[in-house]
Amino acid sequence: MKIGVFVPIGNNGWLISTHAPQYMPTFELNKAIVQKAEHYHFDFALSMIKLRGFGGKTEFWDHNLESFTLMAGLAAVTSKIQIYATAATLTLPPAIVARMASTIDSISGGRFGVNLVTGWQKPEYDQMGMWPGDDYFASRYDYLTEYVQVLRDLWGTGRSDFKGDYFTMNDCRVSPRPSQPMKVICAGQSDAGMAFSAQHADYNFCFGKGVNTPTAFAPTAARMMQAAEKTGRDVGSYVLFMVIADETDEAARAKWEHYKAGADEEALAWLTEQSQKDTRSGSDTNVRQMADPTSAVNINMGTLVGSYASVARMLDEVASVPGTDGVLLTFDDFLAGIDAFGERIQPLMRCRNHIASVTREVA
């Protein structure tokens, strides 16, 4: 099973709590995180894009770096780890994204890929006059389908004459082209999102579910497999989890309860309000899960809380779910968390035995 790190491009990472570590996003912080991840043989690093935060006492995600420029910088200071940036497709023409991706492919030596998002949070785009109207909620994957067709044309042949409802290319050209086939990932959890990933993506991200229920996402992975069967493609799931680990289960649980006790209710209320804006996409979207009150303090990503041994065991359970190709990890404290993962958790994981072998050979 592949392991990735979801780098904190926004302030405070993924904990919406006054009791969580409070920090601003910087290049130096993210460089330290990704270089540590590479040292411990993580397979990939991904950054999201966020253009407007949730506010509240913690000013959650009110402070964000930009994904492509951040990952270009990180590509230049790493050598092995795969690097993924996220394109907010309402803000960037596909021909520009194709050229930026080709540039970072050159910087990274073929280690770069692109995560495509349609955009669900209206205020991110409305503030710039770029929101296309609420009908977009129902048509966003039609838009994204044309978008990725233009990308594939330009990366594959260097030119595009695509004509669609949303994009018109007139002998559009991009050169140089990427040195490797460009990986495209998506985070579709709705039926429409999974159908898109099945047709166009190489991997699909999904949320883990619950606290210490590592296989609860299995129905989502099964839906992705079923969607991919219809297109005859192999599109595996990468699952998002937060790791909160300590020497004992009790110590880790105490940290988790402390974070929950400091939940930033004002920021969470704003998230809930935004999640109700999309009435077109059904009840199975990512944002619906993010705003669920069960564990909104970390936007309801799957959460693994326990001793190092317990977390290793739960991650092995994740790996056992059919259709799972990898996990995307966040941490309550990224620098300490990645060290703990590399030194205390990963060596205990059966699904990462190949990493232990590599480490022994290097030593």
UniProtKB/Swiss-Prot annotation:
UniProt lists the family membership as follows: Belongs to the NtaA/SnaA/DszA monooxygenase family. RutA subfamily.
Its annotated function is as follows: The FMN-N(5)-oxide reacts spontaneously with NADH to produce FMN. Requires the flavin reductase RutF to regenerate FMN in vivo.
Q: From the UniProt record, list the reaction(s) this protein catalyses.
A: uracil + FMNH2 + NADH + O2 = (Z)-3-ureidoacrylate + FMN + NAD(+) + H2O + H(+); thymine + FMNH2 + NADH + O2 = (Z)-2-methylureidoacrylate + FMN + NAD(+) + H2O + H(+)
- Pfam families per the record? Bac_luciferase (PF00296)
GO biological process per UniProt: alkanesulfonate catabolic process; nitrogen utilization; uracil catabolic process
The reply to whether Flavoprotein figures as a keyword in the UniProt entry is yes
Write down what this protein is called. Answer: Pyrimidine monooxygenase RutA
Q: Which UniProt keywords apply?
A: Flavoprotein, FMN, Monooxygenase, NADP, Oxidoreductase
Organism classification: Bacteria, Pseudomonadati, Pseudomonadota, Gammaproteobacteria, Enterobacterales
Q: Could you confirm whether the keyword Oxidoreductase appears in this record?
A: yes
Recorded hits in InterPro entries, A to Z, give: Luciferase-like_dom, Luciferase-like_sf, Pyrimidine_monooxygenase_RutA, SsuD_RutA_monooxygenase
Q: What is its EC number?
A: 1.14.99.46
**Matches recorded under PANTHER family:** ALKANESULFONATE MONOOXYGENASE, ALKANESULFONATE MONOOXYGENASE-RELATED
Cystine pairings recorded for this chain:
none
Gene3D superfamilies named in the record: Luciferase-like domain
Query: GO molecular-function annotation terms?
Result: alkanesulfonate monooxygenase activity; uracil oxygenase activity
Enzyme class, top EC level, equals oxidoreductase
Signal peptide range equals none
Q: Where does FMN bind?
A: 49-50, 115, 124, 140-141, 190
